[in-house]
Design a protein with these regions (language model features):
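Small-polar-interrupted transmembrane alpha-helices in polytopic inner-membrane proteins
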Residues: 52-60
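Residue-level recognition of pore/gate-forming positions within transmembrane alpha-helices
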Residues: 11, 56-57, 80
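Generic transmembrane alpha-helix motif of multi-pass integral membrane proteins
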Residues: 33-52
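N-terminal membrane topogenic signal
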Residues: 1-6
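Membrane-embedded alpha-helical hairpins and interfacial helices in multi-pass inner-membrane proteins
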Residues: 7, 15-39, 63-173
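Single-residue recognition of alpha-helix boundary sites
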Residues: 44-45, 56, 159
Length: 173
């Protein structure tokens, strides 16, 4: 059930986030989808890794990314989840953001994630796949992704403060 629940939650968060416009014509609350991926991985562990990859692929296609582009990025989809797995190793056993210890490990995880994931997707979008030029990929996409991910990591703690007690009550954590 955790794989299916992850797919539903991530796709639902993607749909909701893409309908909330932060900057007209430029920025939606796409961060909500990424935050939900991390929340699901923290709550469900390994099954969420599988569900999140499927959810990202389906969500991108529903949002209008062509199957050709999705195929060119296919080996990159598990990358974000792999880095989230590092965060799971740090705080997955006790992801309670009411505890100071959780915040310390979370800060370390976010630092590692932000140092590597935006440039890796810059590479994936440009030189690896050829979808965008290297210039656009590194000087436009990478900084935009960095900014989007800042919102992601701001959203995770309040989401976890609500999701963890609910998951415990439902027997999912």
């Amino acid at each position: 059930p955790q794989v299916a629940l992850t797919i539903v939650l991530v796709m639902g968060a993607g749909y909701l986030g893409s309908s909330i416009v932060l900057v007209e014509g430029a920025q939606t609350l796409e961060s909500l989808k990424d935050a939900m991926v991390f929340v699901c991985i923290l709550l469900f562990g390994y099954p969420a890794l599988i569900g999140a990859v499927v959810a990202y692929i389906l969500s991108d296609m529903i949002e209008g990314v062509s199957p050709d582009v999705v195929w060119r990025w296919i080996e990159c989809f598990p990358m974000t989840e792999a880095y989230c797995w590092i965060g799971y190793q740090f705080i997955g056993k006790d992801p309670d953001f009411r505890k100071l210890r959780t915040w310390g490990w979370y800060a370390l995880f976010v630092t590692i994630f932000m140092a590597f994931v935006p440039p890796l997707w810059g590479f994936a979008c440009g030189p690896l796949s050829g979808v965008f030029s290297a210039q656009d990929s590194y000087y436009k996409i990478t900084p935009a992704l960095f900014l989007t991910l800042v919102f992601t990591w701001i959203l995770v703690p309040p989401l976890m403060l609500g999701a963890l007690p609910l998951a415990r009550r439902l027997g999912l954590y």
